[in-house]
Amino acid sequence: DKRTDSDFSPKPTIFLPSAAETNLHKAGTYLCLLEKFFPKVIRVYWKEKDGEKILESQEGNTIKTNDRYMKFSWLTVTEDSMAKEHSCIVKHENNKRGVDQEILFPPIGKAFTTINVNPRDSVLRHENVNNATDLEDCMKGRKDMLQLQVTTTYAFYTYLILFFKSMVHLAFVVFCLFRRAAMSCDDQRS
């Protein structure tokens, strides 16, 4: 049985809110994509870091992909709690060592202070980086991470648009087929 020698715990991918979203709406949405888990039963909830209260969040349906499952969960954070860290807690029977996964999301304000006019000062202030090569590596890593997030977000919306376009096309084709079938039935009666 291939399930005994494979890792079937949820694999998280996180998406942070865009600067445009936080500036325009004075709120931000954290998104957690959980992939490649089995079995289907999973529980996802959100908390402030080190908090006990479960926050109101949304989630999509659990979707089967080949022999495993995936699920989205998202939390919209209002302006008054944007400065706090948040955690996405994942309960699943195949979590490593049987411990709930806790996926940390940085404060929204802090996530954007690293992308400012003088990023060198920002990195030094928040991470105490003293070595110039460490600083450059850190900045390159952040740039790569931001590029990955932007690319993934664009890919997600592109596939979503293509999906809806396919649904409209399918509806049109089905309509034409039923119309043609109805016309041929009318011709046979006459």
From Swiss-Prot:
Residues 179-190 are cytoplasmic. InterPro entries: Ig-like_dom, Ig-like_dom_sf, Ig-like_fold, Ig_C1-set, TRG_var/const_region. Residues 1-157 are annotated as: C region. Gene3D superfamilies: Immunoglobulins. The keyword Membrane applies. Keywords: Immunoglobulin domain, Membrane, Receptor, Transmembrane, Transmembrane helix. It is a single-pass membrane protein. GO terms for cellular component: external side of plasma membrane. This is T-cell receptor gamma chain C region 5/10-13. It comes from Mus musculus (Mouse). The lineage of its organism: Eukaryota, Metazoa, Chordata, Craniata, Vertebrata.
